Swiss-Prot record:
Belongs to the ubiquitin family. CDD domains: Ubl_FUBI. SUPFAM superfamilies: Ubiquitin-like (SSF54236). This is Ubiquitin-like protein FUBI. This protein is synthesized with ribosomal S30 as its C-terminal extension. It comes from Mus spicilegus (Steppe mouse). The gene is Fau. Pfam families: ubiquitin (PF00240).
Length: 74
């Protein structure tokens, strides 16, 4: 299925739904140079856990995931 990932640019990925959020972060890192530990992947504004698969998160075909930078501070 196709998935859209919006980071600094919009990317289209071909996925099966079995990929983990961490794998998506690795892919974004290779495309945009943002370290995975500095990324937060959001679905409808809610952050997704690295260990969860896309299917477990409810990601369907043609879904757009947002990638935000992790905020520093406390």
């Amino acid at each position: 299925m196709q998935l859209f990932v919006r980071a600094q640019e919009l990317h289209t990925l071909e996925v099966t739904g079995q990929e983990t959020v961490a794998q998506i972060k690795d892919h974004v890192a290779s495309l945009e140079g943002i370290a995975p530990e500095d990324q937060v992947v959001l679905l409808a504004g809610s952050p997704l856990e690295d260990e969860a698969t896309l299917g477990q998160c409810g990601v369907e075909a043609l879904t757009t995931l947002e990638v935000a930078g992790r905020m520093l501070g406390g």
